[in-house]
Regions:
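Well-ordered alpha-helical scaffold segments within catalytic/enzyme domains
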Residues: 18-31, 41-42, 78-93, 108, ...
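Short, solvent-exposed loop/turn and secondary-structure capping segments
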Residues: 45-47, 53-58, 83-86, 114, ...
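Surface-exposed patches in mature extracellular/periplasmic domains of secreted proteins
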Residues: 50-57, 92-98, 161-171
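Extended ligand-binding clefts on enzyme/binding-domain cores
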Residues: 29-35, 116-145, 161-276
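Signal peptide processing junction and immediate N-terminal pro/mature segment
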Residues: 1-11
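Membrane helical hairpin/interfacial module
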Residues: 69-78, 82-138
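Low-complexity, Ser/Thr/Pro/Gly-enriched N-terminal "stalk/linker" regions
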Residues: 2-4, 16-69, 116-118, 122-123, ...
């Protein structure tokens, strides 16, 4: 059920059964089920054992030239967490095991480095310490953290009326949510959100979040924050650029409607749309 109240998935089995790709599928539904289960396994079987979060990359040969075996990614973990929720609801993994995994994730995130309530893009999955994404990108990443929190809020809603362990999980997520200081990332009260802040480099990354790209979720969450909300002008003047986000471009005869950053005439990459 949509609110997670029906425990239809509480059955034995720790791994979605996807052994061996079938030579053919009886119908599209069977094929899509197989794909969904297989993708779920990246987050279920491939997760960092200590944190439960998604690795930035998995090398099947076990060789990591950049010594990044334990690096987990916050945004990618958000997508994976949404997948776990779907897996629980569809019975690919048991509700009990799913809650245990999600509890591990949330407990880890509560102890990991945060910067005004916001996580870094990369985290050491063993220690919870920030792994710099770039020379000056060693602090809070509002975009990646918003991808993460968007899925955590889905988890909160799914389990908030469950058993005691599930209610505790939902409550701990709510605490992390209320500690995210979206207002801090206005960089001194500007009418725009900023992508990064570092305790070592401050605002040196200097990346205001202006549309259109994959970052709309930051404004949705910022506007709805019960503790650190942003004003409407932040969206209208920052993200929507006081109307400057509109576009009249028609690549291949199709109207873009929105001005795509860096690709105003042709349109940006497709991932911008599903990310937020």
């Amino acid at each position: 059920s949509a609110d997670g109240s029906t425990d239809k998935s509480d059955k034995p089995g720790t791994t979605p059964d996807v052994t061996g790709r079938p030579a053919s599928f009886a119908n599209d539904e069977e094929m899509l089920d197989y794909i969904e289960k297989t993708h779920l396994n990246y987050m279920w079987e491939g997760a960092n054992p200590n944190s439960g979060l998604a690795p930035e990359r998995i090398h099947l040969d076990g060789i990591y030239p950049q010594n990044d075996k334990h690096v987990v990614t916050t945004g990618g973990s958000g997508f994976g967490i949404a997948g776990l929720l779907a897996g629980i609801d569809r019975g690919y993994i048991s509700r009990t095991e799913g809650v245990q995994r999600l509890t591990k994730i949330v407990d880890f995130l509560g102890k990991a480095d945060r910067f005004h309530g916001v996580w870094s893009h990369w985290i050491d999955g063993n220690t919870g310490k920030t792994v710099p994404f770039g020379q000056k990108d060693d602090g809070g990443d509002l975009v990646e953290s918003s991808f993460l929190m968007a899925s955590l809020l889905c988890v909160r809603q799914y389990f908030e009326n469950g058993n005691e362990q599930e209610k505790l999980l939902a409550s701990n997520i709510d605490k992390l949510w209320k500690e995210m200081e979206f207002d801090w990332y206005r960089r001194g009260g500007q009418d725009v959100l900023y992508w990064h802040w570092s305790p070592n480099y401050g605002w040196d990354m200097n990346f205001p979040l202006e549309g259109y790209n994959e970052c709309l979720i930051t404004y949705i969450l910022g506007a709805s924050s019960p503790t650190h909300s942003i004003p409407a002008d932040c969206y209208h003047k920052g993200w929507a650029r006081s109307g400057g986000i509109k576009s009249n471009a028609k690549p291949y005869g199709y109207p873009l409607d929105l001005k795509h950053n860096g690709a105003e005439q042709t349109g940006g990459p497709l991932f911008w749309a599903p990310y937020s």
